[in-house]
């Protein structure tokens, strides 16, 4: 299933530059999956507030530190 989205010309040009022979879907999927990008996109599209993202980042950092402490024992 395909969907049509509207993006500004400058964003389109950026995607074209990094796309190479990949599809736009592949590029966008890769960008969303990279660490931190999903939350940034959620803020950009207004589905999460900056405060929610900061709270999520703090919680993620705490979990990462806890996991590292388990590995160091």
Curated annotation (Swiss-Prot):
Pfam family, one: VAPB_antitox
Keyword Secreted set for record: no
Top-rank lineage group of the source organism: Archaea
Keywords: Toxin-antitoxin system
Its biological purpose: Possibly the antitoxin component of a type II toxin-antitoxin (TA) system. Its cognate toxin is VapC18 (Potential).
Membership in a protein family: Belongs to the UPF0330 family.
Name of the protein: Putative antitoxin VapB18
Organism (species): Archaeoglobus fulgidus (strain ATCC 49558 / DSM 4304 / JCM 9628 / NBRC 100126 / VC-16)
Gene: vapB18
């Amino acid at each position: 299933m395909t969907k049509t989205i509207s993006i500004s010309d400058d964003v389109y040009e950026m995607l074209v530059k990094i796309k190479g022979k990949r599809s736009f879907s592949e590029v966008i999927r890769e960008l969303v999956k990279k660490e931190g990008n999903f939350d940034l996109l959620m803020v950009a599209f207004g589905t999460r507030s900056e405060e929610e993202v900061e709270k999520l980042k703090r919680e993620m950092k705490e979990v990462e530190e806890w996991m590292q402490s388990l590995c160091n024992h």
